[in-house]
C-alpha cells in the first residue's frame, strides 16, 4: 500500500507553484524540467527522450524553430506547463497523483498527448510525485510503492552499442550484461563495472583505441559488423573478469523496427524474412548465455512475437516498441501470448499513473517488468525509485559509465542501504 491517496484535507499539501524550464539532456538537446512547490515540500523532475522511438508513443512537443537548437527547442512545452497546466493544478492536493494525471490528460484532449506535449505532462507528473514524497518526508520509492517496496532489480547494462546508438555496422542496438547471480545490488553493480572495464581492454587490444569510444548510453561502440563478434567479446569479458555464464547473462535489444524494411530484416549483411530471423535468434540463444531479447521484430509484428515467445519459452522476450507502455497494446499482447515481458518507459505513455497501470497489468499476467531509461537522459533518478516501487525484476539504464546513467545506479545503492536488512535483490 502506497502513500498515494491517503490525504486528509490540508492546505499544507496544496500546489502553490509550478515552474518549467528548458534544460539540456545527455545528447545536448533541449528537454523539459519542472519544479512543483507546496508549503511543505518541493519536487523537481527532468524528462528523457528516445533515439529509437515507437510510432505509438506519446508525443513529445518540439518547437520546430530552425533558428533554435535545430528545431528541437521545447519552449512551447515549457510555456504549456507554466500557463495552461499550472492554472488548472494550483490549489490541488499534491498527493492526489491520479487525479492530477487524469486532469492533465483531459486538458490535452488527444490520445498521444500531442497538444500539451508528453514532455510537458510527464515533467509535471514526476515532479508532483516528488513534491508529494518530500511533503510527507518519505523517500520517493516508499511514497510510490508503500510497504511492498523492498526489492532491488537486476541491472541489465548496455555495455556494447550498435544500431541507432552507435556509428558501427551492428544491426542489434544493445548488447547487455546482467549480473543476476549477485546477492545484492551493491555486488551486482561491482560485477557490471568490472566486466565493463575488462571488455574495454579486450576491445582496445583487438580493434584499437577508437573501439572504446562510447555511444549514447555509455556502452562501447567498436567497428563491428556481425552480432557474433559482439557476443564473443561479451562472453570473453565475463570469463576474464572471473565470472561464469550462470552468474552473468547477456541481454539483447534488437530494436528490429530500425532494420526492418520492405518486409525484410537487414542484419549481419543479409536480408532475412521473419521466420529466418526467428531461426537466427534461436541459434544465438543456443550458442550464448542469452537471458532476454527485446523487440526482436518490427513493432506491429504481434504474431512473430508470439511465435518466438513460444519457441524460446524460457527466454525473456521483451516488448518495448511493441507495447510502448500502453495498456491497450499490452492487453493485446497478453491475449495473444506475444512476448512475456514489458519494458516500462514512463515517457512512452506520459504519466506516472498510466505507467503504474501498465506495470500492474503486466505483473498480474505473469509478465516480467523491466524499467528503462531513454538514450537521451538527465541526471533525474525517478526511474530508479519507480523500479523499486513496482517491484520490477530488472532495470535498464545504460553502462556503468556517464553521469546520467550512473545517477540511477547510485540511487539504487542508496535505496538498498536505506532498506537495510529488508532489502531483497531479485532472483531471476
Swiss-Prot record:
One of its GO terms (molecular function) is phosphopyruvate hydratase activity. Keywords: Cytoplasm, Glycolysis, Lyase, Magnesium, Metal-binding, Secreted. It is found in: Cytoplasm; Secreted; Cell surface. Its main location: cytoplasm. Gene3D superfamilies: Enolase-like C-terminal domain, Enolase-like, N-terminal domain. Pfam families: Enolase_C, Enolase_N. It catalyses: (2R)-2-phosphoglycerate = phosphoenolpyruvate + H2O. (2R)-2-phosphoglycerate binds at residues 173, 345, 374-375, 396. The active site is at 217 (proton donor), 345 (proton acceptor). SMART domains: Enolase_C (SM01192), Enolase_N (SM01193). Mg(2+) binds at residues 253, 294, 320. One of its GO terms (cellular component) is phosphopyruvate hydratase complex. One of its GO terms (biological process) is glycolytic process. Its cofactor is Mg(2+). Coiled coil: none annotated. The keyword Transport does not apply. NCBIfam families: eno. Belongs to the enolase family. Catalyzes the reversible conversion of 2-phosphoglycerate (2-PG) into phosphoenolpyruvate (PEP). It is essential for the degradation of carbohydrates via glycolysis. This is Enolase. The gene is eno.
Amino acid at each position: 500500500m502506497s502513500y498515494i491517496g491517503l490525504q486528509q484535507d490540508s492546505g499544507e499539501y496544496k500546489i502553490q507553484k509550478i515552474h518549467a524550464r528548458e534544460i539540456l539532456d545527455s545528447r545536448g538537446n533541449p528537454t523539459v524540467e519542472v519544479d512543483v512547490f507546496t508549503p511543505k515540500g518541493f519536487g523537481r523532475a527532468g524528462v528523457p527522450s528516445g533515439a529509437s522511438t515507437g510510432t505509438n508513443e506519446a508525443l513529445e512537443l518540439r518547437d520546430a524553430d530552425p533558428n533554435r537548437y535545430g528545431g528541437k527547442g521545447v519552449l512551447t512545452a515549457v510555456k504549456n506547463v507554466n500557463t495552461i497546466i499550472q492554472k488548472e493544478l494550483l490549489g490541488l492536493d499534491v498527493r492526489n497523483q491520479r487525479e492530477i494525471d487524469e486532469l492533465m490528460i483531459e486538458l490535452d484532449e488527444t490520445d498521444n498527448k500531442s497538444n500539451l506535449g508528453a514532455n510537458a505532462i510527464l515533467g509535471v507528473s514526476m515532479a508532483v510525485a516528488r513534491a508529494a514524497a518530500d511533503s510527507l518526508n518519505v523517500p520517493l520509492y516508499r511514497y510510490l510503492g508503500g510497504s511492498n517496496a523492498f526489492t532491488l532489480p537486476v541491472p541489465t547494462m548496455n555495455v556494447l552499442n550498435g544500431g541507432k546508438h552507435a556509428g558501427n555496422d551492428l544491426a542489434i542496438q544493445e548488447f547487455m550484461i546482467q549480473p543476476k547471480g549477485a546477492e545484492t545490488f551493491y555486488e551486482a553493480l561491482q560485477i557490471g563495472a568490472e566486466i565493463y572495464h575488462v571488455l574495454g581492454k579486450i576491445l582496445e587490444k583487438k580493434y584499437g583505441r577508437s573501439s572504446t569510444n562510447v555511444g549514447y548510453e555509455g556502452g562501447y561502440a567498436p567497428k563491428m559488423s556481425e552480432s557474433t563478434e559482439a557476443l564473443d567479446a561479451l562472453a570473453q569479458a565475463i570469463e576474464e573478469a572471473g565470472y561464469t555464464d550462470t552468474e552473468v547473462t547477456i541481454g539483447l535489444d534488437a530494436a528490429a523496427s530500425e532494420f526492418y524494411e520492405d518486409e525484410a530484416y537487414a542484419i549481419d549483411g543479409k536480408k532475412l524474412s521473419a521466420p529466418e530471423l526467428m531461426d537466427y535468434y534461436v541459434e544465438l540463444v543456443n550458442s550464448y548465455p542469452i537471458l532476454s531479447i527485446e523487440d526482436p521484430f518490427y513493432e506491429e509484428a504481434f504474431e512473430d512475437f508470439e511465435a518466438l515467445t513460444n519457441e524460446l519459452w524460457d527466454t525473456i522476450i521483451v516488448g518495448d516498441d511493441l507495447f510502448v507502455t500502453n495498456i491497450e497494446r499490452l492487453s493485446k499482447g497478453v491475449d495473444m501470448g506475444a512476448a512475456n515481458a514489458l519494458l516500462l518507459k514512463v515517457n512512452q505513455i506520459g504519466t506516472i499513473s498510466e505507467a503504474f497501470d501498465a506495470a500492474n497489468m503486466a505483473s498480474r499476467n505473469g509478465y516480467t517488468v523491466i524499467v528503462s531509461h531513454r538514450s537521451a537522459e538527465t541526471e533525474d533518478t525517478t526511474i530508479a525509485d519507480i523500479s523499486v516501487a513496482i517491484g520490477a525484476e530488472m532495470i535498464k539504464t545504460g553502462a556503468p559509465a556517464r553521469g546520467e546513467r550512473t545517477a540511477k545506479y547510485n540511487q539504487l545503492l542508496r535505496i538498498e542501504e536505506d532498506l537495510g536488512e529488508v532489502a531483497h535483490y531479485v532472483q531471476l
